[in-house]
Amino acid sequence: MRGFDKLDLESLPTPAYVVSLDLLEQNLNKLDDVQKRSGAEILLALKGFSAYSAFPLVRKYLRGTTSSGINEALLAREYFGGEIHVYNPAFTQSEISQLAEFAHTIVFNSQAQLDKFADFARSCAKA
């Protein structure tokens, strides 16, 4: 398997996630090229890739993360840094209170949720 020629895959405990940092960096270079040529900012979706041991490499190329809830957002804050964007279909007031302290963007699921939490989130962020 390309990128793993020096690794005895049969000796690894299972289940296990194995990441080739060389191949990951090749992909990150492609994403960086897209960012530079388009002006877009690409975020790491933690739902799809939350291997925090690779975050030091990934954060060299990507501006921040997108999280689908409080736990992923806390992971981003502790291990990734950068911009933290959060979406959740049903935030609680406690989650909004925490997220307002560090999240750069909170995306609400509906107008009703925005109406319910927007003023509270703003007040938490200013505190």
Describe the function of each predicted region:
Residues R2-F4, Q26-L31, Q35-F49:
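N-terminal glycine-rich anion-binding loops that anchor highly charged ligand groups
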Residues P13, V18-V19, S50, T92:
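Generic, ordered loop/turn and secondary-structure boundary motif
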Residues A16-V19, V34, I42-L44, G64:
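Broad hydrophobic/π-residue packing in well-ordered secondary structure
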Residues A40-A127:
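Active-site-proximal beta-alpha core segment in soluble small-molecule metabolic enzymes
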